[in-house]
Each structure stands twice: as structure tokens, then as C-alpha cells.
Amino acid sequence: MSDDHNNYDRGKVSRLPALPLPPDAITRQMFDEQISRGGHILNMHLVNAHAPKIARARRHVTYALRNECVASRKIREMVIVRTAGLVKQQYEINHHIPLALAAGVTREQLDALQGDWAAKKAIFSAAEVAALDYVDCLVERRGDIPDAVFDEFAKHYSPQEILELTHTSNGYYATGVFIRAMKIELDPEDRTTAPGKF
């Protein structure tokens, strides 16, 4: 591949060795799909490709969360940025800020989501506040959600949306921990993920 952003041979991008070349058939297929969906091959993809069958399985979940949810893209991006902020994972924040902006999240909201968003509750809708309270408990209290928080969340979201948002937060929490454990290097700003459906 001549495009530098989609070059497999980037060398070491984490604490793991560089991806052996040429990539196997599963990895090549995943990379080709990423490019066909409008994204670049990211450092995280190169690291995950050390276990191609696991990477392929994870991509199915990621694809579903990005393209097949009932919950709005805006609230999903808020949940992702908030979760990434709580686990202090700049890698995912960098990739999701453009997606969140495209989904209708404001710059002021994005700034708040990475810090003490509750001090700026007025810039969020009641449904967004309910979701963010839930996510904070999900991450900071390790899933110990008080009934009052869950009940308020359930007033605004269907059971399917509750599961979608819970899986979104859980998925990005796990990804944040994985990125930190592997010490994956940040991608350049112009190397972007596939945007998915808005």
C-alpha cells in the first residue's frame, strides 16, 4: 500500500514487537475492510493483529456498536468520550472527538466530558445527564449502580438502548485498559478511524 497511513510496515508501535510481515490473510482482510469503510490502519489495529482471530471477533462488536444501534450516535459518542476520560485514555479521545462533533456534540460538551461534566450539567439534556450519571457509576463504581441512578436512566432509554450504552462504555473501558497495558503510541491526527453510520 502506497498510502503512508495504510502502510503495514510501521515498525514497533507498542511494547509488543512490530507486526510480522506480510500480514496473514485474516489481518489483510480486516485492514482492507477498514480502508473500504473510510478509515486508516491505526496503531491499535497493528497491535491487535498479533492475534488476528481475536481481533476479527472484536471488530464485529465494534462494528455493531458503531453502525447497528438504536441509541443515537450523539449519546454513544458522549458515552465513549466520557468513558475514555475516566480511564484517562487519550488515544480513544483523539479518535472520537471528530466523530462526536460530527454527531452533534458541542466543543463545550466535549471539554466537560473529559473533566467535571457535572459542574456543567446545564449544557446537557436530562437524558444526557441520566446517561452520564450511569456511565460514571458504571466505571467509577465498577458497575454498582444505585437504583435511583438506574431508574432515572431507564426513564429516558429503552432496554435495548440501555444495553447498547452499557456495552459501549464497557467496550471502551476495556479498550482503554488494553491500550495502556500495551503502551500503544498515539496515531497522527490525520490518521483516522472509519466513521461508521450517523
Across the structure, where does each feature detected by a protein language model lie?
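Mobile cap/lid helix-loop segments that border enzyme active or cofactor-binding sites
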Residues: 1-73, 197-198
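Short acidic alpha-helix initiation/capping motifs at coil-to-helix transition points
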Residues: 8, 35, 53-57, 88-94, ...
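Short alpha-helical scaffolding segments that buttress acidic/His motifs in well-ordered protein cores
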Residues: 45-48, 62-65, 78-84, 113-114, ...
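Short amphipathic alpha-helical segments and their helix-coil junctions
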Residues: 55-68, 112-115, 147-155
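Conserved alpha-helical segments that form or flank metal/cofactor-binding pockets of metalloenzymes
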Residues: 71, 75-109
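A contiguous pocket-lining binding segment that forms or flanks enzyme active sites
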Residues: 103-136
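Acidic/histidine-rich alpha-helical segments that form the ligand environment
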Residues: 123-167
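Preference for long, well-ordered alpha-helical segments
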Residues: 149-152, 159-198
